[in-house]
Structure formats: C-alpha cells, structure tokens
Amino acid sequence: MHDAESTVDSLLKEIDNEMEQTKSNITQNGSEDTPHNWKLPLQEIGDDTMEMLVKHNTRSNATENSRGRSPSKMSTISNESLNLGLLRVNSELEESPAAVHQERIKNSVANGALGHANSPKVLNNLKNMAQDIDKLARDEEKPVKLSSSPLKFTLKSTQPLLSYPESPIHRSSIEIETNYDDEDEEEEDAYTCLTQSPQILHSPSRIPITNAVSINKLNLDFTLNPNESDKSLVSDTSVDSTGRELDTKTIPELPFCMSSTPEMTPVDEKCNLPSKLLNTSNNSHSDSRSPTASVEDLNISTNLPGADSSQNNPVTTDADALIENDVVRDLQQNMEHIDDAFDEKKVLDEGCSNEPVTFLGENDTRSIVYSNKGTNANVQEFSQEDSLAHSEPNFKDLNATSDDVWNEDKETDANISTSTKSEESYIADYKVTRQEDWDTKKLHQESEHANEQPAIIPQKDSSEETFTELNNESEFQRNSKDGEEYRIVQHEESLYGQRTKSSEENIINGSEIGVDHGEADEVNEPLAKTSAEEHDLSSSCEDQSVSEARNKDSIEEKEVETKDENIETEKDESEYHKVEENEESEHVPLLPPLPRWEEIQFNEPFIDENDTSNDSIDLTRSMKPSDYISIWHIQEEEIKSNSPESIANSQFSQQSSITTASTVDSKKDNGSTSFKFKPRIVSRSRIYNPKSRVSSLNYYDNEDYILSNSEWNALDPMRRNTLISKRIQDNIRTQKGHAPLIRPSVMKLNGEDSGFQNHFLEVEQPQEHENIPLSTHLSEQDITTNVGLDEQKLPTNTQDEAEISIREIESAGDITFNRGDLLSLSFDEELGQDFANFLDALDHDSTSFNHGPDDSSSFQRDSSKKSFNSLWESSYELKPPPSIRKQPIAPDVLQKLLESDTKDDADLEKIREERITEPRTGLGIGMLKTPVKDVSIALAASIKGYEASFSDTDSRPEGMNNSDAITLNMFDDFEEDKMTPSTPVRSISPIKRHVSSPFKVVKAGNKQENNEINIKAEEEIEPMTQQETDGLKQDIPPLLAQTKDNVEAKEETITQLEEPQDVEQEFPDMGTLYLSIKAISTLALYGTKSHRATYAIVFDNGENVVQTPWESLPYDGNIRINKEFELPIDFKGKAETSSASSERDSYKKCVITLKCKYEKPRHELVEIVDKVPVGKSFFGKTKYKFEKKYVQKKPKQDEWDYLFAQDGSFARCEIEINEEFLKNVAFNTSHMHYNMINKWSRIADKIHGSKRLYELPRKAPHKVASLDVEACFLERTSAFEQFPKQFSLVNKIVSKYKLQQNIYKEGYLLQDGGDLKGKIENRFFKLHGSQLSGYHEISRKAKIDINLLKVTKVLRNEDIQADNGGQRNFTDWVLFNECFQLVFDDGERITFNAECSNEEKSDWYNKLQEVVELNVFHQPWVKKYCEKLAEEEKTRTTGHNLKQDFN
C-alpha cells in the first residue's frame, strides 16, 4: 500500500514537470495522430464549457434536449454533500482504495439518489469555480502549488495481459496549460506515461491514472449481493469530499474514441452481463463524446478525506481480488481473440475502433458498450444495408430533443450488452443469478430520482453532432454485423444437426434462430443453458428500443420466439408441400384407358390367315416354297378343299361380320375395341427389278392357252375349263390380230396366273428404229411366242387385213377393253366393298400417297355400288407424279394417238360421247413407279386372298412388248422407263416454258461470257411451242424410247427454242410526259389594279381539260404558277404494216390558256387644268393661274373590252409534242420558253358605240406574255413499268435507286444452296448494288452471280426457324446457327453465314435487307434516268474544266 502511494506521489510530480513538453509534442502530432483532441482556451470558457465540465464529471450520456442554455440548468457533479468550495483547501487525509471506490459509487450517476442536484448551492459553487478560472486566465498568474500532502490511492497492481498498442486512437490524454515553472516537464511526463505500454505503466514507478482505475473498481460489484448493492446505491449518506483547484488554463475536449486497456475489455453485442454489472458499469462515462472519461482525465485532483470510510465496505477489496483473478484467467484463455480485438492495424484501417452503441440519459443504468470492428477476424462483414436494417429501429436519434424521448430514456431499465464470440467463457464465469423483483425495485427507485432533475446537455456544433451520428451509425452497423454472423453460424449448425427435432427442443437448446432481421438475436448457448431468464432478457435487448422496458421486452421476446417457431414450422411444411407438388407435377394426369396393344407377332390383322396387305415382298422369289405368300396360298387351297364354307374369302360364303371389319371401323373404336391390330410400320419398300431377270409369258405358250398350274390359284377367272377364260382368250387373240398397237395386256405374277387377271387397253409405243406402221398387226403365233429379254424382237406382219376400230374391238366380246374391267365378271360385289373399306383406312394413314395435279378421277364412294376398281379411280395417286404429268394432254390429242387412219370424224365424235357416258370402272394395278430406274414401290401383296399384280421390270429392253408392264393409268405418260438425265434447261418434257433463274452459275475463267447454266431447285415446265404442238397433231404418237442421236437432236431443238425471240411487246402507251408550268412573265396588260383582275390557267391535252383556281392577277405582270401536269403519250395511229420501229403517225398537242376576269370601272379619273384668278389691279388686267386636277368622269369606253375573248381568254400557248420534242426531254429535265399569243383582241371603234363588239375587226395575233415550262419524258420500255403521278416523286425514286447502287460490301461467307447441291462452301462475296457475286475462296474466280432483284425477303435465324416450323437438323444448327437466308420469288432459298463477329453478320444482314427493300425503286426508267443524269454531270464537269483551262 505504501509503495503504491509513494508511486502516485512521484508520478504527480513528474506530470507537473513534464507538462510543457507533453503540450509541445501533442501540438506537433495532434493534427495527425489525434484529430479529435483540441484545446479550448480559458478565455473562451463560458456556460457551454461549464456544461461540458458537468458532463465530464457526472458521467452522463443523455441525449440533447431542447432546453439549451437555460438558467435553470442544474449540474450533477456529485451528490449534494459535495462542497465545491473546498476545492482550494489542501487535504492531507489519506484514503484507502475502498473508501475512494465507495465515494465514487455514491457520487456516480448510478446512484439513484439524485435529488440533491436541485440544490442551488451546487450551482453557485460551479459558477464560482468558473469565475476563478476566468480570473486566473486574465491575470496570468501562476497558481500557487498546493502544499497539501499528495493524494494517496490504494491501487492493486496487476500484471499486464496484453501488448498495449502505442496508437493515438487508444489514448485518452488531456493537455492542460498551467503557469507552473515545471509545466513542460510535467506535461512531457504525462504524455510519455499515457503513451507507454501497459508493461511500463504497471511498473512500481509509473502507474497510469486513466479510466482503467475506474473500470477495475467497477469489477468489485460483480460479487455484491443485491441487498448490499441496493443499499450502497440508494444510500443518501454523503461523504465530505475535497478537491483541488484546476491546474489548467484550457480544458480540451476528450477524444471520441477512448483507449481500450486490458483492464477495460471491449464488450460486444452478444454478451449478456448481469444487471449489477450493467448498472454500475456506467461509472466510466461522463461525456457523449467520451463516455469513459473520469475525473483523472480532467487532472482535477480529488483529495477525498475520511479514509475511515473505507471500512464501511470491507468486502470490496476481497471481491476485487476474486474478480480480477477470474478475469486474468479467462482473458489468458481467450488471448488470441483479444489480440485481434486490440490489433492496431485493423483499428487504424477501419477508422474509429471503439464507438458507443448509444447515448443514454442521465439516470439510465445501462452500460456504454464498445464494439471493436476488428474483434474477431473471422467474423463475416455484412453490408451496410443489412446492418442498418437490423439495428436502426432499435435506437433513437442521437440529436433528439423532445421531452418524450427524454422521459423514455429515464424510464428505460433495459440492459443492452454485447459480447463477441471469443468472450463467451469470460461472460459465462459470472454466474450471478438475477432476481426480477429486485431489478424492478431498483428500476422504480432510480426512476424516481431521475424524474427529479434532468440532465444538462451542452450545445454542440452541427459538425460535432453530425460526426457523432455517423460514428454511432457505424457502430450500430458493426454491432449488427457481429450479431448477424453469430446468428448465421448458429442457424447453420441447428439446421444441420437438429433438423428433425421438435421446435420446443430447439428453443431449449438455444438452436432456434430467427430469420427476420427485426427479431432479437439469440443468446449464447452456455448462458441459455444456465438461465432461461437471462436468455429471454438478452434476446429482447437486441431488438428493443431505448424507450422499451425489460418486462415488455421479455414478453415480446417470447412472442417473437413463438412466432419464429411457427414460421419455421410453416416453412418446413411449405417446403414439404412444394416437394410433393413437384413430385406430383412430374406425373401425367390420369387419362382415359388406352387400348391395349398386343405384342408384335404374326397374327392376322383382318382375322384372315391369308391376308398379307401389309407385307412387301420381293416378287422374284414369290414362287419358292419358303416364301410366305406361297405358303399362305398353299394353306388357303388346303383349307378350301376341306371346307369351302369355313373360309371368309370363299366364293361359296356370304358376307359376314368378320369379312366386313375394316381398318376404318377399327380406328373409330380404337379406344375400346378388342381388335388385335398388328403394329407393323408399313413403308414404301422398294423392290429391285434387275434387267437380267427372264420373264415368262406362259399364257401364250400354245394354241390351247395352257395356263400355268398353280395349286393355290383356285379363284383364277382365266383358269382352264371355264367359258370366261376361253372368251377372254378369244378376245385377246382377236385384238392381237387386228390391233397390234392397241391390245389387252395381261396381268401376271412371275409367269404364273395371278388371282385375278384383268385386261385393259394399253398403247404400245413402237421403237423408233422399227417404224411399225399403224396398219400392221401381229400374228397369233407371234403373240403366243415366249419373248425373252434379249433373244427376239417384236416381229411385224404386212398382211393387208381390215383394221378394226376401237369400237369394234370393244364390241367383239363381253369385256370392255377401254376400261379393262374383267374382274366384275367373275367376282362378287362384296369384295369391292371390303376393298373400299381398306381404301378408307388409307385415307387416315399418315403415309398416304400424293395426289397428282392431273388426277381427273375422283373417289366414287357410292354406298349402293362399290367395286374393287374404285381403288384405281380414287384420288389416291399411287406414285409420285413426275414433272411430265404437270400439264395434262388434251383429250383430242390423246384420241388422235389411239385412233386409226380410217376413222372419220363422226366415228370419233360417237366414241367420245360413249366414253363420257360410260361408267369409269377401269382397273389399274398395285405397282408404283418412281423416276429411279429399275425400282418400283411395292404395296400390299394380297388383299383378302387376292393377289395384286406386279410387273416383272420397270425397264423394257429393246424387243420386249408392252405386255410385260402394266402402268398405273390407261394411257400413261409417253416416256416412263428410260429416264434420261434431265436438267433445268434440257428436259425431256413435251411441254416446256422458259423461266429465268434468280442466280446464274458463272463458268470459271470467263465471267463475262453468257454461257450460264440456269439453276433451279425444282423443275418448271416451259410453255408448249408451236412446233411441238404440230408434232402432237400428227398421226404417229410420240415415241416411248429414243436413240442417243434422236435425244441429242431433240435437245438441240429445245436449246434453240429456249433462245428469246424478238417479238415486240405491246405497250399501253409510249410513256409519261411531265409538264411543269413555272411562270408567265412580261404580261402586256395594264390597268390591273383598277379592274381588280383575276386569272386562271387552263390545261388541255386533247382528252382532258384541267383548270386551276382563280387567283388575283399581280400588278407587276409576272404570274408565278408552279403547276404540274401529267400527260400520258399515246399512239395516235399506225399503219397496218408498221413495225415496232416505224414512226408514229401523230402526237398530242398541249394547249395552255390564260383566262382573266375583271370589273369595269364605274368612273374614270381625268386630268383637267383649271384657270384660277389670282388678283386684279384697279386699272389692270386680271391675273390667272392654272391648276391641274383629277376628276372622276364616266368613261366613254374601256380598252379591256377589246382585249379578251368572250370566255375571258387573253393568251394561249400550244406545245406540239412530236418525236423531236420527246427526244430532247427524254429522261431529262429541260427548261423551255414559249410565247403566249393573243388572237382575240379587236381594233377599237373611233366612234364609241357605233358598232357592236363582234363587228369590230380583230387584230393580228401578237405576243402578250412569255411562258416558262419544265418538261421531262419517261419513255416506257416495259409493259409492267409504273410511273409516279407527280414529277416531284421522280427525284425521290432516283435518289433511292442511287442509294441502292452505292451499297457495297465484301467478305467471306458460307453458302448453302444455289449452285451448291448437298454441300456447303466458303466463298468470297462482293455485294454491289443489287448484284451479289461469289468467287472462289482462294483463286477468286467467279462462281456465281445472284440477282437480288428477284429476292423477296431476307430472313434472320429466328425467322428461318419460324418459317420452317422450327425443325432444323444438327448440321444447320452448328454451321448456320446465326445465319441469314435469301428467299427468291420462286421459292428458291440460299443460306449464308459469316465466320466473323456478330457486328459483321448484322452488317451483312442489314445491307442485304436494305437492298431488297429498295428493289421497289428498281425499274428500267429509273436506271435510264440515272444514266442520263450521270452523262449530264460528266458533260458539265468537262465543260467547266475546259473553261478553266481556257482562262
């Protein structure tokens, strides 16, 4: 004890000696290190300074009220027993630390008995002290040094725990100017002492007198019982205190951020301290800007007498020792975290390290808590918005001055305390249980004393207030960041470890974390387990405002936790429901039951073992026993032999429900039927027919027509031993003998008799080299002879026999050869009905056949009579129509191909009528032909047991007759078998027309040559020429096969026909002439003003007359008209023998007439000379003067009466439009001047009124005005040209055309389409105007020229997808993902893509789009007009250059 007292005495002396040095050091470093330390001279001390001193000594942190500097302000420096007048009295009493601490407790703001502050004695003493300070400042006298014995403090020395950072931010230094001789030395010692580390400060020779002393003393109350603490706080017993006079001239304001020493550990938001600690901890604050300042900071020596008062509370020293030991132990355990809290670098980087959480009222018992931004390095920094959103509602405005806020501050007993996560063990050691009744009682007592005297708040500058607000707001943000980090960590741990536990267990274990930022932060788990009451209080403290009481907060916290529990439960339930909904959404909603499909097996779809309608087979192997068709028919024959009635297809059975079942009916009842449909994918399988296959014609073998014996062909209508078979054979023989070119063709299957042999007429086209005449016919032996592929050719016979006409052949038997309906004679009608039902099923099939454009037959669905033949009469085209079918052949031409030479017109007309009236029952076949050679498309092999016939081959070599192939139509196209490779310009079609191509392929090496090949995506038929029409009218039909020479000759003919012929195209007119009447000048008409004349222009072109509105005639005689007229130039007449180059007989005349209207003047001004007498002498003459006057007189005659015609015409100009005139103004604007003639004026009569006006003679025509005209003629060069209605639009159109021609771009593009078929190529393109030219990528040889005038639109990538229905293959997606496409007027498309940036692609697209949009301005007259303008510009430039050279 004695050592400590001597140490304090020596320290005070050193402070006095080094004071001056300290002042100088602070002056040099104050602006850099301590920006908040400033000095206030004593001369400026007034009421504000005194109020600031009061604030320092009372440790109050109340908010500023609105009363300002009121004379009624009371200071609460200490209790009423404190005599400030004793400050000058030296005290020699020694006090124990316990007594000092007890005295501070009584004088602190925590003391609830503050009623003595109302004493006027305290205020008087304060004023006296201020006056003494002012007097010392004025006199500049050196104060007498106190001779009293030095102060003796009982301080317990502790070892330093941490390295004290030597930072000005952590110093709480006050520089005081004194008049002592050793002032410099004392200030220097004080400054050195304050800036030293705790190790030096705690040495025996130097102990700092800082706020650390009061903080250590505050720890003494941790072990006080509630009753004892209550007595010491509420006790009214006063202890006499003595002080000493202020040792300074100036009292600087304390820095905002106080130092944090090991004894004053910063406490964070999450720490829940006991109420006793909170109630007593505010002893350390005395100012809103430096809440932890104490008396020692002001250098006011408080020599408190009455050392024996230290015996009043002997427990204090022991408790202090116990508490400090606990503190030392706990801080050593948390050394790492505390080092982070006092890290100087973090503090300096982040600004003010310690800032108060809030400012409290005078009697508020809450502790001012500091939060270090760098306390925990692992704490996640939250955003300012989150921190403010969390903390801002919990605090009042720092500058609030309303009484309501003041009262709320006094009534508040909430304990706001925070703690960092690293200090949980430090807080947990203070296991002091609090009692709610004691706290309530203490709150009541303190509130009573607080209501008696309000705090005196000094007025501060606006800058200080703003700075305080900002610092506190930043402190709130840091505190909220720590709280947010703690809550997130706890929330993650609780969700991970206890997701399946109930909400009640989560609340007990402290793992239930609030989600909302507005909810209170949860307490640490150790404190939550220790006391539920502390958990409620600490949770409520985070969210309550300064005006809320603890009890209310406790209740609200419970409600918040309950609500939080409900929210968490609802969130879990909602997440669970969302998961269920997502799972349910993945399932397809229940639909009506679908039909149950059977497995793919070899069961029959039509409940018929012999039906193979969905099979496609190779007919070359149909006779082998291993084929299904042979096996099935063999089985059919066996079944029929046993029981014919049991077979549905038997000729003995009637139609049953089983046989009438069709695919259409099954499709209608697809959802509920029990029909076992075989889900086999039926496609158009192609059957290869090699030419080397030998075809046998067994039905022509011998005289008796022994047909091939087939065990399964029991239903053959031509089978042996039947009358029908022999009748058919006889008809065949007769037809073969009399009409070799028009004979029935027998349907067969690989040389064997088919299920139904149908005959119909087919024209055989003879080979060109055979030259078979129409009159020849084949003999019977020739007909029945086997014909091999390459063995023998069709012989000819020149026997002169009477030719039989088609009508005679048809009437020879019961068979109608022109329709070939032999099946109706041998089969029942029910088969046709079943087959019709099968055709209805094809109608619903997605793979239905294409309809031919020339298909004139329609599907006869007459329920009364349907036959099997309706298949071939239906609208179903069973093969893709080639290009030669696009133009039907006229019926008369077809008839000529079929008739003989001997038929007359009457017979032909009769046959034609009968053909029209006959029912169309002709039969085709089930064979499809494609343009591919030797390939046919196979359909059903059999339907209900009846075989469809197929041809052996699609290609007939030389020597084969036409019986080997049955074509689809009765009269098929002329050339079907030998498909000569065709090109767009060289086609074998008999009907051709020339269509220009949007682009041309340029031969390499010579782009200028016109040897382009027109490329077309789809072949188009050219119009029939006269030569080809004449050829069709000949008796000899077109040839089916041509030799190579003939083909070449035909191609040459077609090439010649393709060349354009010079045929004059009839134009509707010659063109359009635009006349613009600019003005009429030098008008010889006087007296316009007096006559009030008006004028109008009459424009007459011989067909129409146009008159302008009447306007006032200008007085100067110059009329500005600016009227424009459009004049179509027609052909007036032609000679009959005139050609396109002949001259026109006559042209139009344009007559322009000027008409006037005027008013006759009623009076005429006449000049007269009056003789006025001037004066008269007495004997002299009278003198006169002459004066001129104008008087109005009635005019005798008006000159204008003789100038105009009766209709008002005054001047006329006739413009003759002849060839020379049109040539001069063609595609050029020319300025012309014409004289306007007056031929209506008459010679005035000398004697007015002697003759009538029409009796007067006329004057000779004479010029009365000049007409200025601009003319331009646009000559028509095409019948489709369109001319604008006004000449003003011509210039606009020309400007648009020039804009199009000036568009230029070049670069590399990927091309797909056009001349590139099936491949993509990178080329170099040049865009110039409406021409897009493509060149080779490397050699730059011309490859393609694209005429953009035929492009209708340019599509982007998204437009291409929409136009194509959104279907794109993978190659297009990769190479042409961001492409553009040119669409031509004929449907041709060319796709381009640029391997460059998006800007380059957009540039290509924009330029092409602009060119296409400007195509509407691209007409022949526009082009010629631009060329004419270019020539004029060139001529004008040349003339100007020559003129300059000449000069």
Curated annotation (Swiss-Prot):
Annotated segments matching region Interaction with IQG1: 768-879
UniProt modified residues of type Phosphoserine: 10, 78, 81, 91, 96, 167, 367, 511, 616, 805, 811
Biased composition (Basic and acidic residues): 1-16, 475-494, 549-580
Description of post-translational modifications: Phosphorylated by CDC28.
Skewed-composition ranges (Polar residues): 22-32, 59-76, 277-316, 497-509, 538-548, 649-664
Region (Disordered): 1-37, 57-76, 272-316, 444-588, 649-672
Gene Ontology CC: cellular bud neck contractile ring
Residue positions where Phosphothreonine is found in the record: 365
Intrachain disulfide bonds: none
InterPro entries xref list: Bud4, PH-like_dom_sf, PH_domain
Pfam families in the record: PH
Sorted UniProt keywords: Cell cycle, Cell division, Phosphoprotein
Induction comment from the UniProt entry of this chain: Cell cycle-dependent with low levels at START and a peak in mitosis (at protein level).
Primary subcellular site in the record, as a coarse category: other
PH domain ranges (all copies): 1302-1413
Quaternary structure (record): Interacts with AXL1, IQG1 and SEC3.
Function of the protein: Required for establishment of the axial budding pattern in haploid cells. Cooperates with other bud site selection proteins to recognize a spatial landmark during mitosis and they subsequently become a landmark for downstream polarity establishment factors that coordinate axial budding and cytokinesis. Involved in the septin organization at the bud neck.
Protein's name according to its UniProt entry: Bud site selection protein 4
Organism from which the protein derives: Saccharomyces cerevisiae (strain YJM789) (Baker's yeast)
Recorded name of the encoding gene: BUD4
